[in-house]
């Protein structure tokens, strides 16, 4: 999708805020712990290349979702370690090795397939994934992990790390978290040849369970200034939300009582009122269920009326503002603020999803 630079809808990304957020977490965790910046999904919509470059002096490496995301960073000149968190099938190994990209291996079936395809792992750096209770990918016993590590070494791989992922680190009830932690610790204790790096801490674990950190952390949503729990748990230190979203009024008119607005005529004016049109819609990630939510104009909350269209939405105004008047969808406007978490709560989803749905059609300004 092409970025639309010739309309007023833009996302502004504060790279300094991201750097300061990472620094705040690093002060909170034990000394000597390695930091991986999680920049998958285009750095949660913030721009993977720009964020990675900004964090280059602060972090030890990066985590991405797939090989294409890793190659994007390499092609941009990022020379630190890049770990693919998802599973890379053996037929892509050559490209990973050629670009010094670390891969995750999560099953003995992977080894069987690599041998079937006569793939060697010489020069390949690997982190082994353990399923301690998340239920997606990973091995479930020390016996399996020992066999996998031995097999990988036979194929020439460097098994650098082993890791797991917690399902409920961002929840007040830590029963499941503790079950997973004990499972992982027991599995690690049963290894015959423990890898150099052991990591289980995502953003939530890093800030609320810092006493359980091994020797590396993976910092995702906290880097971008958002609470991993939404608003369920209090942050131990302040964060700065790094992305703001703004547009401008491109059309303003008066409508009369009985006039309708939008597809499906879901809004009917009860009296004469001013309506403004803003050039952002569900193709930009501003979803249709945002009808009834508010944006900020001149420090005032203005309700979205009528259905959100593909490219536009309409808002009720208190007066006839001039064309070009700033509209804030995420961020501050004259001491009033709309956070990504506010939007997530309205949509009954999580702040991660709100950011990741912001499409490439919205230019990112740094």
Curated annotation (Swiss-Prot):
Catalytic activity: L-alanine = D-alanine
Enzyme superclass (EC): isomerase
EC number, UniProt record: 5.1.1.1
Alphabetized UniProt keyword annotations: Isomerase, Pyridoxal phosphate
Active site residues of this protein: 40 (proton acceptor), 263 (proton acceptor)
Co-factor(s): pyridoxal 5'-phosphate
Record PTM N6-(pyridoxal phosphate)lysine, positions in chain: 40
Xref: PROSITE patterns: ALANINE_RACEMASE
Pathways involved: Amino-acid biosynthesis; D-alanine biosynthesis; D-alanine from L-alanine: step 1/1
One Gene Ontology cellular component: cytosol
Residues binding substrate, per UniProt: 136, 310
Pfam families: Ala_racemase_C, Ala_racemase_N
One Gene Ontology MF term: alanine racemase activity
SUPFAM superfamilies associated with the record: Alanine racemase C-terminal domain-like (SSF50621), PLP-binding barrel (SSF51419)
Any GO BP annotation: D-alanine biosynthetic process
Family of the protein in this entry: Belongs to the alanine racemase family.
Role played: Catalyzes the interconversion of L-alanine and D-alanine. May also act on other amino acids.
HAMAP family for the chain: Ala_racemase
Protein name per its UniProtKB record: Alanine racemase
Organism: Streptococcus pyogenes serotype M12 (strain MGAS2096)
């Amino acid at each position: 999708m092409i970025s639309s630079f010739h309309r007023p809808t833009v996302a502004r990304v504060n790279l300094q805020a991201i750097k300061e957020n990472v620094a705040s977490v690093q002060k909170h965790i034990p000394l000597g712990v390695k930091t991986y910046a999680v920049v998958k999904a285009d750095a949660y919509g913030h721009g993977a290349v720009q964020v990675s470059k900004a964090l280059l002096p602060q972090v030890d490496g990066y985590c991405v979702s797939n090989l294409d995301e890793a190659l994007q960073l390499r092609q941009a000149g990022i020379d630190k370690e890049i770990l693919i968190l998802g599973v890379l099938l053996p037929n892509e190994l050559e490209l990973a090795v050629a670009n010094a990209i670390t891969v995750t291996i999560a099953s003995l079936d992977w080894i069987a397939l690599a041998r079937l395809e006569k793939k060697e792992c010489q020069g390949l750096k690997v982190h082994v994934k353990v399923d301690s209770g998340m239920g997606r990918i990973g091995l479930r016993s020390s016996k399996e992990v020992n066999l996998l590590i031995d097999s990988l070494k036979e194929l020439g791989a460097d098994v650098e790390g082993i890791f797991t992922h917690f399902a409920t680190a961002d929840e007040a009830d830590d029963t499941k978290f503790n079950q997973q932690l004990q499972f992982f610790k027991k599995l690690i204790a049963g290894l015959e040849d423990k890898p150099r790096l052991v990591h289980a801490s995502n953003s939530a674990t890093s800030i609320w369970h810092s006493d359980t950190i091994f020797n590396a952390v993976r910092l995702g949503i906290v880097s971008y200034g958002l609470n991993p729990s939404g608003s369920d748990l209090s942050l131990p230190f302040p964060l700065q939300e790094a992305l703001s979203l703004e547009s401008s009024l491109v059309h303003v008119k008066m409508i009369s009582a009985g006039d309708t607005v939008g597809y499906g005529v879901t809004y009917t004016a009860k009296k004469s009122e001013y309506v403004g049109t803003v050039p952002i819609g569900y193709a930009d990630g501003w979803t249709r269920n945002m009808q009834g939510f508010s944006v900020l104009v001149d420090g005032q909350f203005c309700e979205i009326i009528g259905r959100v269209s593909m490219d536009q939405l309409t808002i009720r105004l208190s007066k006839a503002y001039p064309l070009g008047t700033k509209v804030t969808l995420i961020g501050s406007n004259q001491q009033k603020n709309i956070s990504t978490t506010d939007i997530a709560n309205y949509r009954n989803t999580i702040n991660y999803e709100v950011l990741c749905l912001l499409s490439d059609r919205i230019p990112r300004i740094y």
